[in-house]
Swiss-Prot record:
Gene (UniProt): rplC
Subunit annotation: Part of the 50S ribosomal subunit. Forms a cluster with proteins L14 and L19.
Keywords of this entry: Methylation, Ribonucleoprotein, Ribosomal protein, RNA-binding, rRNA-binding
Signal peptide: none
Pfam families for the chain: Ribosomal_L3
PTM comment: Methylated by PrmB.
Modified residues (N5-methylglutamine): 153
UniProt name for this protein: Large ribosomal subunit protein uL3
Length: 212
């Protein structure tokens, strides 16, 4: 199933089983997603389902976006997302219809993608879990230095992908195969076991697990 749902991370809590076992869960608010466009091979070169979620003040929506939402006959949302479709997926779904959290009622595991918390510019120890160097015994300036970053005249360069200091976080991260603990259709809530990327209030993309 390629069709997913756009939600918003509320935060973490825990629930207890009948045996008294504590299960850490992340609460995701997944209000009904409104279909704004159906992309097809004939017109767009690929097949996909475009949706919006949440709401946005009218004075914060530009004319192009306002026209797009009006054409679909839906209320303006806080963004636009697409789900690629395969084969006959998406049959029966029309522009203006809604997709709710109930699509996961029979799903046992999901993949959740979000934007991780930004940590700014960080050194190699924090960013890549490097070991620090000696605190003494001749070392006075390089306690948290990464060490050598290359070899010699040959190859005479630093290889691409070398783990060094730099921007940490604030990138898209996907956590796979999270157990679905509870689906609360009445309150548009989805509870999954464990944590998901990002800070509370951040948008997340929920799909059925590909490795389930």
């Amino acid at each position: 199933m390629a069709i997913g749902l756009i939600g918003r991370k509320v935060g973490m809590t825990r629930i207890f089983t009948e045996d008294g076992v504590s299960i850490p869960v992340t609460v995701i608010e997944a209000t009904p997603n409104r279909v704004t466009q159906l992309r097809t091979d004939e017109t767009d070169g690929y097949t996909a389902l475009q949706v919006t979620a949440g709401d946005k003040k009218a004075n914060r929506v530009n004319k192009a976006a306002a026209g797009h939402f009006a054409k679909a006959g839906v209320e303006a949302g806080r963004g636009l997302w697409e789900f690629r479709l395969d084969g006959n997926e998406g049959e029966g779904i029309e522009v203006g219809s809604e997709i709710t959290v109930e699509i996961f009622a029979e799903t046992k595991m999901v993949d959740v993608a979000g934007t991780s918390k930004g940590k700014g510019f960080q050194g190699a120890i924090k960013r890549w879990n490097f070991s620090h160097q000696r605190n003494s015994h001749g070392n006075s300036l390089s306690h948290r230095a990464p060490g050598s970053i290359g070899q010699n005249q040959s190859p005479g360069k630093v290889f691409k992908g070398k783990k060094m200091a730099g921007q940490m976080g604030n990138k898209r991260v996907t956590v796979q195969s999270l157990d679905v603990v509870r689906v609360d259709a009445e309150n548009n809530l989805l509870l999954v076991r464990g944590n998901v990327p990002g800070a509370p209030g951040g948008d997340v993309i929920i799909k059925a697990a590909v490795k389930a």
